[in-house]
Amino acid sequence: MNYQPTPEDRFTFGLWTVGWQGRDPFGDATRRALDPVESVRRLAELGAHGVTFHDDDLIPFGSSDSEREEHVKRFRQALDDTGMKVPMATTNLFTHPVFKDGGFTANDRDVRRYALRKTIRNIDLAVELGAETYVAWGGREGAESGGAKDVRDALDRMKEAFDLLGEYVTSQGYDIRFAIEPKPNEPRGDILLPTVGHALAFIERLERPELYGVNPEVGHEQMAGLNFPHGIAQALWAGKLFHIDLNGQNGIKYDQDLRFGAGDLRAAFWLVDLLESAGYSGPRHFDFKPPRTEDFDGVWASAAGCMRNYLILKERAAAFRADPEVQEALRASRLDELARPTAADGLQALLDDRSAFEEFDVDAAAARGMAFERLDQLAMDHLLGARG
């Protein structure tokens, strides 16, 4: 297989990813700032489909209207020159100190109103640039201590904010949807809507739930010790996987943002298998940080590695599914039975069926092996390149 990406693969990158300068809580930047235009051109050369941005990635915070127009003009020209797309945009409501207690759920009402206006302004730009999805990551929406935040009131304010944003895009006739990005902690000690499940439950309370989905990130769910492919499966099941952030993470620790495939490789395999078999048609968006040890050659090598690893795993997953032994092993593990309704004949038929309880042989059923180990080893063989 050719592992050279093309725009048809729909790989996208945030400007903040390749543009990360390597600054962390313990050390200063190790790389200069990247011009967004340079990022667009270099990613296009690597075979990417598009780029995404926070408002402050593209337009420095505090820019005048004329400066803003010039930044947007240069960026738009780079998009036109390269054919790169902007499928998604988002708002930075976490860097400036004004957001130290959050944006939509800050205790200070004036900060909340400012956060909404900042978001609305960037939604206008996102739509102008062709974005179909608007991501909301509430990195500062949370607390470090129990008395600092009444979570019920905070969720009311969160709901109010999203309802207002939904009202705005509807009134403007914008064809754009929102994707909530969960994260359990960091930078706040505890963040509201910490997992995919929390976000899905929250969405059902909104006035226009059809406008809202989720943008799960590999590392964020794995920071909480959760199974990322399972979370994605539930989002797909709910019809709410509006966007996805791909990266690498090694277990429960800080948010590593490794290149995709460089963390939990087995989870990455099952994730790609799921996305491809489910027919997910959205962008494969990489939200990672090239390590601060790297110069710009390393930055572009890391970005290329994200795409290459996805394509390799896509090939391995396809070979796994096409393998006759795997298909037989799936039947031996009774995956086909799981797909059958338990009581398609209805409740009364279930109650009348003596074989379902009175005559059910629990000992025989308990003695049946599931053959999961053989199935899993076949998956490992394909992942490691020993088959197909």
Curated annotation (Swiss-Prot):
GO terms for biological process: D-xylose metabolic process. It is an enzyme of class 5 (isomerase). This is Xylose isomerase. Its cofactor is Mg(2+). Homotetramer. HAMAP family: Xylose_isom_A. Mg(2+) 2 binds at E217, H220, D255, D257. The keyword tRNA processing does not apply. Belongs to the xylose isomerase family. Mg(2+) 1 binds at E181, E217, D245, D287. It catalyses: alpha-D-xylose = alpha-D-xylulofuranose. Its EC number is 5.3.1.5. Involved in D-xylose catabolism. It is found in: Cytoplasm. Signal peptide: none annotated. It holds the Pfam family AP_endonuc_2. The active site is at H54, D57. Its main location: cytoplasm. GO terms for cellular component: cytoplasm. It comes from Streptomyces rubiginosus. GO terms for molecular function: identical protein binding; magnesium ion binding; xylose isomerase activity.
